């Protein structure tokens, strides 16, 4: 499978400045060598307004596209600013206007690449669409969700899976009675509410409360669910009506262990909230199965 490369920009001087590393400007040479060796890559770009966006972003994508087919795709995610920024460069975050401008820019480039390369090549994470209050791409336009782990098309994929899977369920589970809750970050909150509605429409006796959790640990501008900590879950859910089970995304925990980013374990979270907590994969079928079992 392709290796993931954090690109951010292919402008050598700008990359040295952004990464604060005097060797960071040699990225394109390295990627060319990898391509010549037949190694396949996916590129990630964390976009920072006023630094590597607009013209710089176009330059970066053109450089990366020149390495097709070895560079499969480029994922673009908006910068998130934590509250730990003493002595660091001043950064802005995307707002509705700047996110919308970025969507327009990428749509134009996608059309061009589709014509020239047979692929849209550059994909924005769902966060851009949420910030800009604009619709996501259609399911097929994500071309197999090459950068799903970077949050590119995650909402479209999960939403489609939930709707399609619910149509196929016709068994004893439909009579199940239970009350449960879901905890999620700000960016996925609206989607999770819609998903809960879909499930409750099909399962008349299941009640789901969705709770939006603010990221006080890293800072409020960090809105993705995967960066929420157990501390924030405990602080914001401790006196809430959670029903019999709380569901969270598995991505809140470290890859191979049930520990949150603040080093609290899943078991400790369950003890503090006095409730069973079930992590779900970012897959529609897994979420529905776990909630309705």
How should each PLM-predicted stretch be described?
Residues 2, 38-40, 71, 119, ...:
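A general structural motif
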Residues 5, 74, 246:
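Conserved, mostly hydrophobic/aromatic
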Residues 8-28, 48-56:
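Conserved glycine-rich "GG(E/T)P / GGGxP" loop and the immediately following alpha-helix
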Residues 15-19, 55-57, 85-90, 134-137:
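Short acidic, glycine/serine/threonine-rich loops at helix termini
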Residues 23-25, 58-59, 261-265:
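Charged helix-capping and loop-helix junction motifs
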Residues 30-87, 97-127:
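Conserved C-terminal portion of the radical SAM core fold
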Residues 87-104, 112, 260-276:
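Short secondary-structure subsegments characteristic of cysteine-rich extracellular domains
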Residues 133-293:
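Radical SAM enzyme core and accessory elements
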């Amino acid at each position: 499978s392709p290796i993931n490369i954090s690109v951010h920009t292919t402008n050598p001087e700008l990359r040295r400045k952004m990464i604060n590393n005097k060797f960071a400007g040699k990225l394109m040479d390295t990627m060319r060598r990898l391509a010549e060796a037949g190694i396949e890559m996916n590129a990630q770009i964390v976009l920072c307004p006023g630094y590597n966006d607009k013209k710089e972003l176009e330059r970066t994508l053109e450089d990366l596209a020149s390495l097709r087919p070895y560079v499969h795709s480029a994922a673009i995610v908006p910068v998130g600013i934590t509250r730990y920024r003493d002595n660091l460069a001043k950064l802005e975050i995307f707002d509705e206007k700047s996110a919308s401008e970025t969507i327009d820019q990428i749509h134009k480039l996608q059309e061009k690449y589709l014509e020239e390369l047979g692929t849209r090549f550059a994909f924005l994470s769902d966060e851009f669409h949420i910030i800009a209050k604009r619709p996501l791409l259609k399911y097929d336009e994500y071309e197999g969700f090459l950068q799903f782990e970077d949050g590119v098309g995650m909402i479209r994929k999960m939403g489609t899976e939930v709707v399609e899977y619910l149509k196929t369920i016709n068994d004893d589970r439909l009579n199940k009675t239970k009350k449960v809750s879901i905890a999620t970050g700000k960016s996925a909150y609206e989607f999770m509410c819609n998903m809960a509605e879909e499930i409750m429409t099909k399962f008349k006796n299941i009640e789901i409360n969705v709770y939006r959790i603010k990221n006080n640990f890293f800072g409020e501008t960090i809105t993705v669910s995967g960066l929420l900590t157990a501390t924030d879950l405990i602080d914001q859910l401790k006196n809430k009506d959670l029903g019999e089970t709380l569901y969270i995304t598995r991505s809140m925990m470290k890859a191979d262990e049930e520990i949150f980013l603040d080093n609290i374990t899943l078991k400790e979270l369950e003890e503090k909230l006095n409730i069973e907590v079930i992590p779900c994969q970012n897959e529609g079928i897994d979420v529905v199965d776990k909630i309705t079992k």
